[in-house]
Amino acid sequence: MADACSEMDRGAEKYPLLGFGQAVIGPPGSGKSTYVRAMQALLARMGRKSAIINLDPAGEDEPGAAVSLRELLGLEEVMSELRLGPNGSLLYCMEYLQENLDWLRARLQGLRGTYLLLDCPGQVELYTHHPALPDILRRLGGWGLRLCAVHLVDSHYCTDPAKFISVLCTSLSTMLHVELPHINVLSKMDLIEQYGRLAFNLDYYTEVMDLSFLVEQLTSDPFFRRHKRLHEKLAGVIEDYGLVTFMPLSIKDDKSLQLVLSAVDKASGFCFGEAKQSLGNLMSVAVGADFQFTSTLAFQEKYVENDGRTVEEETLDL
């Protein structure tokens, strides 16, 4: 297996798949496929040629997908022939792709220079524990593809302190395990308060500020009070690394999608490439943080109930 991989990687050095792309990851229901379609539409409007690569053997084929793992094998046939459950079958599919990357390389060869959007499976274990998918992404990087991981998380988890701490732990574990330039995204911002009110301003969650306030929120619940020390330790780990922040996104808000693309281009190095060598582009990267903060304020005003007060007035209470 190792010899075959080495031989394949040597061949990749001779015929590199030069290009950029996004590995779109995240738990089920976080909006990965919707994001991929919206991002492809945005890239088309910008005149950037892109292609969808469907690496999820469980879902339906993306309309217009240039490559689909289901052409190699599908989840249903694995479950039927090997008598595995859904989770075991998905892990088997990823391991099978890992061992047959020559198939994927052959399919990608005709897409050299095209911006790739990798729609990945939604099983969290693939990003936090299992080695197959990170190895596949690493090998793609060895072929000359400069990928950025875009990790989508449903924004309504912010309304539940316990769930948000779990999201932070999952995001941190994913960042350390996948080992790619990484952008965390709070998706479906237009539905953020569908299941409850936010305890703090939106920027508290996007910037992952002092988590001791969140732990205190948990202690108000008798069920979580006995787990206070556990939550304090988890919060300490997250703050010690200091890696996790989020960008807000609503597919209905084209400007927020553009900001995510700008952050991805900066992380992957696309904005410094020959296709976009201009002083204006470099300056836009330098001030990107200000635009992101403005975007967060806009989402706060538009989608978060604030009892008639402005964001500035609520900020004074923190």
UniProtKB/Swiss-Prot annotation:
One CC-aspect GO term: cytoplasm
InterPro entries for this protein: Gpn, Gpn2, P-loop_NTPase
Binding-site list for GTP: G29, S30, G31, K32, S33, T34, S187, K188, M189, D190
Residues spanned by motif Gly-Pro-Asn (GPN)-loop: 85-87
Protein name: GPN-loop GTPase 2
Entry function: Small GTPase required for proper localization of RNA polymerase II and III (RNAPII and RNAPIII). May act at an RNAP assembly step prior to nuclear import.
Matches recorded under SUPFAM superfamilies: P-loop containing nucleoside triphosphate hydrolases
Protein family according to the UniProt entry: Belongs to the GPN-loop GTPase family.
Record site feature (Stabilizes the phosphate intermediate), residues: N87
Subunit structure: Heterodimers with gpn1 or gpn3. Binds to RNA polymerase II (RNAPII).
GO molecular function, one term: GTP binding
Keywords for this protein: GTP-binding, Hydrolase, Nucleotide-binding
Domain of life where this protein originates: Eukaryota
